[in-house]
Amino acid sequence: ATVAAVALEVFTLLKRSGTKLKRDLILAWTGDEESGGAGIQMILEKNPEAVACEVALNEGGGLVLGKDGKVKLANLQTGEKIYHDFELTAQGPTGHSSVPLKENAIYRLASALDKLGRYREPARLHPVVRAYFAGRASQEAEPLSGALKALAAAPGDLPKDPLAVVEAEPSLSALLRTTCVATMLSGGTRANALPAEAKATINCRILPDETPDQAQARLTAILDDPSVKISSLEIGGESPASPLEGPGPRAIEKVVAGMFPGAPVIPVLSRGASDSRFLRKAGIAAYGFSPLPISEEDSRRAHGIDERIPSSSLRVGVEVLHRLILELDTH
């Protein structure tokens, strides 16, 4: 909502000032971004020319404030993991709980989940993650700084010791692989009855150069149990990363350098999902870049109690986005 408010303010400013742009400027406010992206999907399906563009700006990255209150870096989201849910279903004979049977749907499901919980994908560097590690290294202290540099520079297999340092941070470890985790369970209808089936929802965040079909095939191999059915609940589809170079990144780098000297622009791969994935799939170079400076402490409040944006950040955000639009208009 805050990014939308800043965008509206900038559009109003451009209109009132009589600014003449050489290129079309489109404002698309879409619903359902948090729970599926139905809004942008409908536009792309029913009226794609309404959002036809070369560069799209969305939330997802942004300006990070240091402890001194100054912008220390700018995260530029150029790609994101594919959100995809799978469902595991195990079946078993029903009956009265006073006569336990060896074949039990809940036990079958529990065995499958235990296999999944003990498995971890081998680490590998997606190009966006490599660029992110290289940029973030300068912002960290040792030993993490050196470990990030070593991984970013590794031409082949990732060196073991630096990898261990980076993987000790769960948020960084998740960028090195496709992840799948159990998030919901259901099974049984009465305490005194053996369940006919038990189900688990598995949420996967898939690296953008993989597909949900590949993730499902890997789940099948991990579980290695034909009695446990794996079905797809949501078609996330492929979501290729946006180019690391081009009009969008160049304009953002120029504006950041002019307003916040010394703050690097670092490409990031988002672990979460946004509407940008649908734009990228449609061939639009979409970039996550919130113009509002925010501290790491406040960013952790997102979707939680006391979620907030400083009023000063709103004022800065208007200037950042205004400059960015004018800069993009020159490309």
Regions found by a protein language model. Give the residues of each.
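Acidic/histidine-rich catalytic neighborhood of metal-dependent amide-processing enzymes
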Residues: 1-75
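Metal-dependent amide/peptide-bond hydrolase catalytic core
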Residues: 62-72, 76-79, 83-317, 322, ...
